[in-house]
Amino acid sequence: MVRAIVGANWGDEGKGKITDMLAKESDIIIRFQGGSNAGHTIINNYGKFALHLLPSGVFYNHTTSIIGNGVALNIPFLAKEVDDIVSKGVPKPNILVSDRAQILMPYHILFDQYEEERLGKKSFGSTKSGIAPFYSDKYAKIGFQVSELFDEEALKEKVLSICEMKNVLMEHLYHKPAIDPEELFQTLLEYREMVKPYICDVSKYLHDAIKEGKHILLEGQLGSLKDPDHGIYPMVTSSSTLAAYGAIGAGIPPYEIKNITTVVKAYSSAVGAGAFVSEIFGDEADELRRRGGDGGEYGATTGRPRRMGWFDAVASRYGCRIQGATEVALTVLDVLGYLKELSICVGYEIDGKVTKDFPTTAELKKAKPVYTTLPGWNCEIRGIKKYEDLPENCRKYIEFIEKELETPITMVSNGPGRDEIIYR
């Protein structure tokens, strides 16, 4: 059985915790898109971790963790991440990397940095991890697959050709030193040795695993609103963040995905530029940011303070719809216990008309939030294990959101720890 875990919002919804929890009953966990540009924060008996490339199931001995063909594979980053968790007492995980995964090159990171500098105030707020240049090359058919590392003659020829092309941009657009093709070739040979133990025909491996009845988790990165087709374009990421892409980025038939667990945050947060209708500011935002997450709302990759907002039912319902959500996991509910009342954005006012449908970016920029207010529960809910033991106003908040999302909320996270979860 294949289950996807994806985000309904801007990312940072708490997918890592939900994956870590569900991995206990799973055999295989797969990252199918994105790269090291976003982090999944996990707190368990080994400590606190922010994983960027490794799937969130690496903390269990019985699981196999897979980097799928849809991932932007930063090989030295992967090696470092494995070393980091092992140094903290985590048993070395069983990792496989698709032989069809493409390599995030050193120059992808440079181009990402230089382009943000060139754009200045018009920049996209990139994490500068090389993601957009990587996917640009992948779809321009000038990327490097892992399998290409093993034909040195062809690899060297390709490096020379690519460097000639890239150096035009490097020298004439960005006015930076040219890429040395010999140095790059040697770097790729080093990458080969780092990744060699993990390489596998992942689609064949998964085909056999499905036939054997294995439990498989597809772990998504970021959320619906960052999808390049269905998100707030152009303030999006460069790979699809939807569960539907899990079939492509892992190499399985789409009909095998039986369950789509969509993770939704009990309030809103975002990193980077772009429209954010329910955003709040000043002391109100600072207080929510300070209390939020598992030690404050700051980007797991960049450390940047996240933009904060009230729960946006319009955006979240849309996010669940385009993910094809079969169930919702509602996270960070415990953070809101200090508030006497809670605002929920239930509609957008655009040019004097109210809509409950999520619009395209041009219209979204004009949207003003339409709020409804619910009473808070004004107490701590961590440690509660049963839904019926939650304060009445807390349950009303959950049930109001569930009705707005039009999708059942089956899990409620009431703390950052692995076991701080309430099932409904």
Which residues does each PLM region occupy?
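Non-transmembrane, aqueous-exposed alpha-helical and coiled segments at domain scale
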Residues: 1-424
